[in-house]
């Protein structure tokens, strides 16, 4: 029995990056031998075990064969006679198909096992598929796109790009389960350059199949005085990259991605203006979130940002009453943390524009001041003072908030 560290751990070590997680392959062993060494079985489709002390995952070397469309249509074979190279050949990219032997004390020993040229592709900054079996798993398209968001200087090798397009044309992407699509998109959004993920998906045609709402934004013009980059799709990519650069959370990045969906449905005769696109964005966003089973935290923030981002940009023109109405519509008084994230997404929208990346955004501070003032109003005390007139409480609290905001930010009520 031999144990090898494989995949991302070897890749990242060669790139001089921190190794976050290690995956292990065990060659020449049976499930019974693993159990005898106190490894705990956890795999459903094929034998995966947890180390008794470190709880890291160890998988028996295996081969796989495509039996049906989609992500789940595979048949696995594992036995002591499966070699390391047979296990590595089923992996997606050459840069992920390298290994090093692990000694009994856990140290990496010996040379890098690199049967498919992964080290050369690392030096050339190329994503290249290992073999023809790449086409058998549509998730690999999403993984390549996600890796592009992480390693933004890498390019997809031409032959790999051709295979990805062929997979899309064959309908393989349509068989992906929504949860897996969301999982890969979410992970890509959290990488350093998420726009690269969408560029790769768009180039192979997959974006139009899994996120047609985003694909439709490319080529849609905007007013150049507001958007020097003009193209709505380009703008959205700049927005998500700005959000990533700031280290914003996944809900903020998803809201940044989806805030302008309605611009794709603007009638041609009114372009490049987009009057009312906020409401159309909400109408498109709801079914998108349902289709991909987007988590509630991401969906709820995205809906607030899609509906209100235009108003958030205009707060310097608002009086106190309009500011309070905006805070109430956004449920900022009850959910101030979510509203803070809405301001982050709005700021990313304002700065995700060509030449305006560092433009001041005083709107955020104005709204933070307004929210502090509005939340300081003692609604309970007002309610007690109107104990016999409950119908008047809501309006009285609202008026008190307007007065507080007017005083705090120095605007008329």
From Swiss-Prot:
<keyword id="KW-0511">Multifunctional enzyme</keyword>
<feature type="binding site">
    <location>
        <position position="11"/>
    </location>
    <ligand>
        <name>ATP</name>
    </ligand>
</feature>
<feature type="binding site">
    <location>
        <position position="91"/>
    </location>
    <ligand>
        <name>CTP</name>
    </ligand>
</feature>
<dbReference type="GO" id="GO:0016791">
    <property type="term" value="F:phosphatase activity"/>
</dbReference>
<keyword id="KW-0460">Magnesium</keyword>
<keyword id="KW-0692">RNA repair</keyword>
<feature type="binding site">
    <location>
        <position position="143"/>
    </location>
    <ligand>
        <name>CTP</name>
    </ligand>
</feature>
<dbReference type="Pfam" id="PF01966">
    <property type="entry name" value="HD"/>
</dbReference>
<feature type="binding site">
    <location>
        <position position="23"/>
    </location>
    <ligand>
        <name>Mg(2+)</name>
    </ligand>
</feature>
<dbReference type="InterPro" id="IPR032828">
    <property type="entry name" value="PolyA_RNA-bd"/>
</dbReference>
<dbReference type="InterPro" id="IPR043519">
    <property type="entry name" value="NT_sf"/>
</dbReference>
<feature type="binding site">
    <location>
        <position position="91"/>
    </location>
    <ligand>
        <name>ATP</name>
    </ligand>
</feature>
<comment type="similarity">
    <text>Belongs to the tRNA nucleotidyltransferase/poly(A) polymerase family. Bacterial CCA-adding enzyme type 1 subfamily.</text>
</comment>
<dbReference type="GO" id="GO:0000049">
    <property type="term" value="F:tRNA binding"/>
</dbReference>
<keyword id="KW-0547">Nucleotide-binding</keyword>
<feature type="domain" description="HD">
    <location>
        <begin position="232"/>
        <end position="333"/>
    </location>
</feature>
<keyword id="KW-0067">ATP-binding</keyword>
<keyword id="KW-0694">RNA-binding</keyword>
<feature type="binding site">
    <location>
        <position position="21"/>
    </location>
    <ligand>
        <name>Mg(2+)</name>
    </ligand>
</feature>
<dbReference type="GO" id="GO:0005524">
    <property type="term" value="F:ATP binding"/>
</dbReference>
<protein>
    <recommendedName>
        <fullName>Multifunctional CCA protein</fullName>
        <ecNumber>2.7.7.72</ecNumber>
        <ecNumber>3.1.3.-</ecNumber>
        <ecNumber>3.1.4.-</ecNumber>
    </recommendedName>
</protein>
<keyword id="KW-0548">Nucleotidyltransferase</keyword>
<feature type="binding site">
    <location>
        <position position="143"/>
    </location>
    <ligand>
        <name>ATP</name>
    </ligand>
</feature>
<keyword id="KW-0378">Hydrolase</keyword>
<feature type="binding site">
    <location>
        <position position="11"/>
    </location>
    <ligand>
        <name>CTP</name>
    </ligand>
</feature>
<feature type="binding site">
    <location>
        <position position="146"/>
    </location>
    <ligand>
        <name>ATP</name>
    </ligand>
</feature>
<dbReference type="GO" id="GO:0042245">
    <property type="term" value="P:RNA repair"/>
</dbReference>
<feature type="binding site">
    <location>
        <position position="8"/>
    </location>
    <ligand>
        <name>ATP</name>
    </ligand>
</feature>
<keyword id="KW-0533">Nickel</keyword>
<keyword id="KW-0808">Transferase</keyword>
<dbReference type="InterPro" id="IPR012006">
    <property type="entry name" value="CCA_bact"/>
</dbReference>
<dbReference type="Pfam" id="PF12627">
    <property type="entry name" value="PolyA_pol_RNAbd"/>
</dbReference>
<keyword id="KW-0479">Metal-binding</keyword>
<dbReference type="InterPro" id="IPR050124">
    <property type="entry name" value="tRNA_CCA-adding_enzyme"/>
</dbReference>
<dbReference type="InterPro" id="IPR006674">
    <property type="entry name" value="HD_domain"/>
</dbReference>
<keyword id="KW-0819">tRNA processing</keyword>
<feature type="binding site">
    <location>
        <position position="146"/>
    </location>
    <ligand>
        <name>CTP</name>
    </ligand>
</feature>
<dbReference type="GO" id="GO:0004810">
    <property type="term" value="F:CCA tRNA nucleotidyltransferase activity"/>
</dbReference>
<dbReference type="GO" id="GO:0000287">
    <property type="term" value="F:magnesium ion binding"/>
</dbReference>
<comment type="subunit">
    <text>Monomer. Can also form homodimers and oligomers.</text>
</comment>
<dbReference type="InterPro" id="IPR002646">
    <property type="entry name" value="PolA_pol_head_dom"/>
</dbReference>
<dbReference type="GO" id="GO:0001680">
    <property type="term" value="P:tRNA 3'-terminal CCA addition"/>
</dbReference>
């Amino acid at each position: 029995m031999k144990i090898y560290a494989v995949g991302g751990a070897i890749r990242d070590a060669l790139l001089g990056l921190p190794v976050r997680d290690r995956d292990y392959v065990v060659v020449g062993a049976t499930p019974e031998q693993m159990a005898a060494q106190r490894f705990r079985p956890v795999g459903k489709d094929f034998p995966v075990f947890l180390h008794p002390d470190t709880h890291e995952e160890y998988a028996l070397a295996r081969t796989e064969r495509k039996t049906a469309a989609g992500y789940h249509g595979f048949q696995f074979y594992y036995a002591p006679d499966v070699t390391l190279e047979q296990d590595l050949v089923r992996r997606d990219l050459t840069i992920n198909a390298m290994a090093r032997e692990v000694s009994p004390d856990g140290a990496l020993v010996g040379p890098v096992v690199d049967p498919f040229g992964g080290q050369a592709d690392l030096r050339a900054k190329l994503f290249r598929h290992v073999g023809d079996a790449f086409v058998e798993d549509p998730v690999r398209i999403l993984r390549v796109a996600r890796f592009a968001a992480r390693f933004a200087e890498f390019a997809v090798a031409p032959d790999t790009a051709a295979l990805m397009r062929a997979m899309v044309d064959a309908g393989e992407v349509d068989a992906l389960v929504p949860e897996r699509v969301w999982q890969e998109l979410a992970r890509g959004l959290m990488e350093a350059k998420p726009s690269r993920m969408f560029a790769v998906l768009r180039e192979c045609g997959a974006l139009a199949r899994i996120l047609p709402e985003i694909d439709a934004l490319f080529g849609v013009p905007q007013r150049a005085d507001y958007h020097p980059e003009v193209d709505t799709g380009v703008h959205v990519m700049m927005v998500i990259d700005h959000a990533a650069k700031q280290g914003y959370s996944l809900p903020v990045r998803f809201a940044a991605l989806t805030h302008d969906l309605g611009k794709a449905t603007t009638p041609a005769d009114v372009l490049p203006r987009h009057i009312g696109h906020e409401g159309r964005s909400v109408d498109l966003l709801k079914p998108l979130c349902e289709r991909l089973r987007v988590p509630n935290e991401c969906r709820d923030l995205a809906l607030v940002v899609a509906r209100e981002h235009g108003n958030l940009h205009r707060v310097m023109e608002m009086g106190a009453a309009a500011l309070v109405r905006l805070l109430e519509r956004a449920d900022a008084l009850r959910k101030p943390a979510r509203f803070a994230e809405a301001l982050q997404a709005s700021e990313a929208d304002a700065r995700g524009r060509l030449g305006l990346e560092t433009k001041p955004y005083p709107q955020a501070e104005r709204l933070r001041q307004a929210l502090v003032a509005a939340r300081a109003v003692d609604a309970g005390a007002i309610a007690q003072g109107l104990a016999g007139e409950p119908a008047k409480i809501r309006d009285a609290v609202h008026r008190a908030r307007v007065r507080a905001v007017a005083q705090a930010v120095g605007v008329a009520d």
